[in-house]
From Swiss-Prot:
Keywords: Endoplasmic reticulum, Membrane, Methyltransferase, Transferase, Transmembrane, Transmembrane helix
Mutant phenotype after disruption: Abolished N-terminal histidine methylation on the lytic polysaccharide monooxygenases (LPMOs).
Origin species: Emericella nidulans (strain FGSC A4 / ATCC 38163 / CBS 112.46 / NRRL 194 / M139)
EC number(s) reported in the record: 2.1.1.85
Gene name tied to this protein: nhmT
Keyword Metal-binding: no
Chief localisation class: endoplasmic reticulum
Stated name of the protein: N-terminal histidine N-methyltransferase
Swiss-Prot/TrEMBL catalytic activity: L-histidyl-[protein] + S-adenosyl-L-methionine = N(tele)-methyl-L-histidyl-[protein] + S-adenosyl-L-homocysteine + H(+)
Length: 558
């Protein structure tokens, strides 16, 4: 193979192509590495310091490029493909210490150990190649240094946009386009850009990745993963990378429940254990009471006092999860439309959680659907709307803005009812802001939490907000009848909301004088970025809670 010196001394086009390739591949790997952290640490916590760290590594690489070139004898570029092959191996073993490392220390430590050196070397070597290829010394040192710097930044940024756009459509479609598969694929591209005999050193890492890395969704690696988590009483039923995260279905073989996982969170679960003399309900019981509480949207009495018949009623459900709530609505004979952004979530709900097929699925971003629907010449309106969106440990704040909730208001019939599930720390400003936004649009609301408030510690909970358009009549629930329970003892206990929360307690949170004051009364689209720090805190709390729900090895093995 040609040594680096000969590559460096070839024509300008060759230098620029290899330099640009290194920058683009570094951008690819940076984004993919972030995706691979999400199943272990959650998507939001993994983002907290990622951008800063990659930026520092890139800047350090650029300004140390001459030192790297001199100290390595122009051989540093050989190490880049080898390092790229070893990154999944390092990450695999470090992820097994995630509980000890904690969050957000775990993502930081993993990236410092693996990703940042790759970014630093890629930028350093690419910088030398781009400078040599452009050969702007005749225009002075200022031009010779800054034009390649700006050009490198543009190329890297273009790589980021390219990989995000590509994966938004194709992630998970093949093994090589899974998260772990992409790490191997990018390493192969690195090797193609910089071929050398040093690649022989990467053979052990490559062999480990394709034979023993349980993160790679192959038949034998899945079997190995099941052997590992079997000691904790779990079995992997299905898994696939998708647009919203790493989606998997897991069975708890001891307690008898099945869950759907999205990254480091659960979209829901249901009991599957069959007991003697037990008649299963029409819709399987969920493991979380909040999904049954959402079904109470049917129990809200109309302002005119006439009971609403299920037959002839229709419902719009924003966010599917495993399909507990929409499944119940369908079982009651309600014409149900489900809007779900992730096609794999919808597929798994049908295949593994008995979601009835007699519904209207809309696989689309809810914001686009609501905007298009409300702007239609004759917008379709619904008797019931259920807003239940939660992935990765943090609420998608874009679906709690004044604009989005106003869109749902336009799609709700005048005597209709909306139920909104909000999961988060009830003490945070972001929670109060979301509640105030909802109340500013719907004049009559009642709030209920899933369980009683804890005496000490963080107050992370699921909360359901029931609202109507009526300004006069308060929200009341009719007494349930046996048919409402769908043959379920669980529903007979949890269908009717019990733990009411005084909505007034959120009226002034964040609006007071002082360091925590001067907040906004409602959330609008252009200001969603103001809530990121609150999302970070809520996601970190959620991570700790999730570690008590499933064993560490289940989260780490993915």
């Amino acid at each position: 193979m040609a040594p680096f010196r000969s590559i460096y001394e070839k024509d300008a086009t060759k230098k620029l192509v290899v330099g640009a390739a290194l920058l683009v591949l570094a951008a690819f790997y940076s984004y993919v590495f972030l995706l691979t952290l999400a199943p272990v640490y959650g998507s939001t916590p993994s983002h907290i310091f990622h951008g800063y760290g990659v930026g520092i590594a890139g800047v350090a690489g650029w300004f140390s490029k001459d030192i790297v070139d001199r100290v390595s004898g122009r051989k540093a570029i050989y190490a880049i493909p080898v390092l790229a092959f070893f990154l999944p191996v390092v990450q695999y073993f470090v992820s097994q210490q995630s509980s000890a490392l904690g969050n957000p220390a775990g993502p930081i430590f993993t990236e410092v150990l693996a990703l940042y050196p790759l970014v630093l070397l890629s930028v350093a070597c690419a910088g030398k190649l781009v400078q040599a290829g452009l050969n702007l010394q005749r225009h002075g040192d200022l031009v010779a240094e800054h034009i390649p710097l700006l050009g490198s930044y543009v190329i890297y940024s273009a790589g980021e946009h390219l990989i995000k756009a590509f994966l938004s459509r194709f992630i998970g479609s093949t093994v090589l386009l899974s998260r772990a598969g992409l790490q191997i694929l990018i390493a192969i591209f690195y090797a193609a850009a910089v071929p050398s005999k040093a690649l022989l050193l990467a053979i052990p890492a490559f062999l480990f990745s394709v034979t023993s890395n349980t993160h790679l969704p192959l038949g034998h690696t899945t079997t190995a993963l099941n052997n590992i988590i079997a000691d904790d009483g779990f079995a992997l039923v299905a898994r696939q990378d998708s647009t919203t995260g790493y989606i998997s279905v897991l069975d708890n073989l001891e307690d008898g429940f099945r869950v759907m996982r999205c990254d480091h969170s659960l979209l829901g679960g249901q009991w599957i254990k069959k007991r003697p003399n037990y008649t299963p309900p029409a819709v399987k019981d969920p493991i979380y009471a909040v999904f049954t509480m959402l079904e109470a949207v049917r129990l809200v009495e109309t302002a005119h006092g006439i009971p609403r018949a299920d037959a002839g009623s229709n419902a719009l459900v924003i966010g599917l999860g495993i399909g507990t709530t929409p499944g119940a609505l369908i079982s009651h004979g309600i014409d149900t439309t489900i809007v779900e952004i992730d096609p794999v979530v919808h597929k798994y709900a049908l295949q593994y959680f008995d979601l009835p097929e007699n519904h209207t699925p809309i696989i689309e971003d809810a914001r686009a659907f609501v905007q298009r629907s409300r702007n239609a010449p004759q917008p379709k309106q619904y008797d019931y709307i259920v807003h239940d969106v939660f992935t990765g440990g943090a609420e998608p704040v874009e679906l709690f803005t004044y604009e989005f909730i106003s869109g749902l208001h336009a799609l709700l019939k005048d005597d209709g009812v909306i139920a909104i599930n909000y999961a988060g720390d009830i003490s945070l400003y972001s929670t109060a802001l979301s509640i105030r936004t909802i109340k500013s649009i719907f004049p009559t609301c009642r709030l209920f939490r899933e369980a009683a408030a804890p005496e000490i510690g963080p107050d992370f909970t699921n909360m359901v907000i029931f609202c109507t358009k009526s300004r006069g009549a308060p929200i009341t629930f009719r007494d349930p009848v046996p048919e409402d329970f769908l043959g379920s003892r669980f529903r007979s206990r949890y269908l009717v909301p019990k733990h009411e929360v005084d909505a007034a307690q959120f009226d002034n949170v964040g609006l007071e004088d002082g360091p925590q004051g001067h907040g906004r009364r409602v959330l609008v689209d252009k200001e969603v970025g103001r809530l990121h720090k609150y999302q970070d805190r809520s996601a970190l709390e959620h991570w700790g809670i999730m570690r008590t729900v499933l064993p560490d090895r289940v989260w780490e093995g993915w």
